């Protein structure tokens, strides 16, 4: 699909992001009749048990089929999954099972997708195969793969209808229904909803509106396979985004409406939170793929956004958001050391960062907000705007309180000078981004049992050293 061709503008190949199994947290709560069976390792099992915070005796609706040595030798995956799925069906009686392939099965080229049809036929339960591995740029794209698997099973239709794509809370869904009713639009269907079996019909006359900026895969799949029309506006984050979203929905059905008064009312309801944000600077170096729309609405609230680092940019899908970030340094797949230097230059009041580097940034003197907080909060639409701005207002108030305690009036970032040590004890200083300074050699080489000296074993200054 030409409209969704990816044009890389990468800062670095490496990336720092959360696990792609994280969307199970909100998806299994949304779809009450679902069960997520993850085919992976003990690391996957540990993540699900700790990150999602559910005790075993609570009978959670997710589990891990742990790979063992037999699986590594090429054993048929279906053979090992049969007794596990049988136990799940007997105990939980799910309406649908999501069979999730993780990093290890993908590397081993295990045919997890091919196991879905025979499992569905044998146990009479719908099985959605999906990929929840760490090869995607962002952990939130796990939801994208789940929705793509569901769209493939959705019934076809020739009628004009509206489908809202993306997991929303009950409050957020209620707002969309109310606004569509007010505009006299078709009753919207949601994917996902409370049942994993209740799939909205999708066809060439369907208007598909994605509410998350990371759903480009499922949107492209629906457009390619079903020929549906894609709702192209900015995403419904903040009063400005919500206004554009609803006015765009009306235009898709041939209606002209104005949400100017509704937007003004929403800004008034957020005034206390916006007051704490106005005039402050916020930078992003995170992994949620929510950075573009949230940076846009923070600018509309009066904040300064000097820097936005995001895991992935699809120029066509994100074009309208990028157009509203003119003058902002937007970096795709940012290199952490280069970003440290940029942050040191801009000295923002708040940095939205992923968990991997949050503590490091705190140690450098920055005030940090975890990017994962944005994924688990109801921040869409007019009603979600106070929650969205409240997240940033609370962090900035904390920043001000700590600054008073420390006797500082603004962020005083520590200089970027991280000392690493070679095996022979000679220090190497790494100055961002990727500037390697040669360290002095020790005056007397360390003895080596083989007769060689540590100086001879030390890497040449011309070699690239990566940390």
Q: Where would I find each of the regions flagged by the language model?
A:
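An N-terminal assembly and electron-transfer interface module characteristic of large anaerobic redox
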Residues: 1-467
